[in-house]
Design a protein with these regions (language model features):
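Helix-to-loop junctions at the C-terminal end of transmembrane segments
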Residues: 59-71, 161, 272-285, 369
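Hydrophobic core of transmembrane alpha-helices in multi-pass small-molecule transporters
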Residues: 18, 86, 96-117, 311-325
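Transmembrane alpha-helix termini and helix-breaking/packing motifs in multi-pass membrane transporters
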Residues: 32-33, 37, 151-172, 176, ...
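Helix-loop boundary and gating motifs at the non-cytosolic
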Residues: 3-54, 220-228, 232-263
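Central cavity-lining transmembrane alpha-helices of secondary-active solute carriers
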Residues: 47-65, 263-275
Length: 418
């Protein structure tokens, strides 16, 4: 999907997303290394990262309930302003509970692609741009932009080690969270430049009752939400900030090395997002989701046994090449399974299900590290593999309706379930 085929608002949204992903890619490296540099324990680091994820849940729920009435553009710009404040707090404060409080605002994210309340708003605002056969390609481009910008941010963070080598008086790494301030303010300006076309319909803005409930596709979405929650729970053990922390702690990897690794991760993610639509067109959405995701999770589990940094990085990069192909296909799959009237609540249900369980992972990962430093990788890979197998078992026979067809019947129950 070329930029010329997008509307003015869609291009602006992708620009704002790119700015945010640049900051998140920079921060994902910086956060893990800074937590290690400041001497926080594994438990304290896990609590801070968990607070970031919990804030994602709370802010996403608030956006889902109030953004259409308060104004999507207004909420979008406010989130960017809050992100600027978070940058100041993480640069200036070493107090664990203060960092947790700012993390709970939901403006910070440990991921560059699916980043909580921002993503929820963007999916709503881009919905009119993504329809029919172009949907999966559109989502692929949307995620690729974030991944590419995030990889550049990670590379920039890696360059800080060169700065310290060249300048003995360079400030501590944590102070570079101030980079969030100009980036976030630029994102806010872009958000405010969007037109009224991205807002909800006037009748939606005037109403007082909650958003429409799911209709005939309720059974399908409830099952998918549960499965997506399981996958997200497993992913919470190995968020990017944790991986940076683990590489630094386990192998003594420098900030520069980690930055280069995450840049390579971002490049492979971008390629993955762009290849996924082509695979989906040939093999189908669900086969692409499952049969790229499952091998990636086996590689993830294998990282726990890496004897050295080179092996760990090789496994991580191989896993990354496959692991993100399910993202645009998953987004398109959910939208294809429901009626047009159900798309907004379906997105809200499935996104919230992913976000709400994710904060548990970093806390448990911190505890698991006390048993074995690489144990979170083994746990994550196992949980996410179970998700793939159940997803295929439950949905491999569920047909995707055409745009004009009625919604699918509820997915078959698991064997033995009543």
């Amino acid at each position: 999907m070329s930029a010329q085929s997008l509307t003015h608002d869609a291009r602006r949204i992708l620009l704002a997303q790119a700015l945010r992903a640049l900051a998140y890619g920079f921060g994902s490296v910086l956060l893990g290394v800074t937590l290690d540099e400041r001497g926080y324990s594994s438990t304290e680091a896990g609590l801070i990262i968990a607070a970031v994820l919990a804030g994602t849940v709370l802010a996403s729920m608030a956006v889902g309930r109030y953004a259409d009435r308060l104004g999507r553009r207004r909420c979008y710009a406010i989130l960017y302003v809050v992100l600027a404040g978070v940058g100041v707090a993480f640069a200036a404060s070493h107090t664990v509970w203060l960092l947790i409080a700012f993390a709970l605002t939901g403006a910070l994210s440990t991921e560059v692609v699916e980043s909580g309340p921002f993503t929820s708003l963007e999916q709503s605002m881009l919905a009119t741009e993504l329809s029919g056969d172009a949907r999966v390609r559109g989502y692929g481009a949307y995620n690729a932009v974030a991944s590419a910008a995030g990889s550049l941010g990670a590379l920039a963070a890696g360059g800080l080690s060169l700065l310290h080598d060249a300048w003995s008086g360079a400030p501590a790494d944590g102070w570079f969270f101030l980079v969030f301030v100009p980036v976030a303010l630029a994102g806010a300006a872009v958000g405010r430049s969007l037109t009224d076309h991205v807002e909800a319909a006037p009748e939606v803005r005037r109403r007082r009752e909650p958003a429409q409930r799911l209709g005939p596709s309720r059974g399908v979405i409830v099952r998918l939400s549960g499965l997506f929650a399981l996958d997200s729970f497993g992913g919470g053990f190995v968020v990017q900030a944790f991986i940076a922390f683990w590489l630094a702690n386990r192998f003594g990897a420098s900030l520069g090395t980690i930055g280069v690794v995450f840049f390579a991760v971002g490049v492979l993610q971008t390629a993955s997002f762009l290849v996924a639509p082509r695979l989906a067109e040939r093999f189908g959405l669900l086969p692409t989701m499952v049969f790229t995701h499952l091998p990636s999770n086996l590689l993830l589990a294998a990282i726990a046994f890496a004897p050295n940094l080179a092996t760990a990085v090789a496994l991580l990069l191989a896993r990354t090449l496959l692991s993100q192909m399910d993202v645009p296909t998953r987004q398109a799959y959910v939208m294809a399974l429901v009626t047009p009237a159900e798309r907004t609540p379906a997105a809200a249900y499935t996104n919230t299900a992913r976000y709400v369980v994710r904060p548990i992972g970093p806390v448990l990962a911190g505890a698991a590290q006390s048993v074995a430093l690489g144990l979170p990788f083994l746990i994550a890979g196992s949980i996410k593999s179970v998700y793939d197998l159940i997803l295929w078992r439950w949905f491999s026979r569920v047909e995707i309706p055409s745009e004009d067809a009625t919604p699918p019947p509820p997915a078959p129950a698991a064997r033995g379930a009543r």
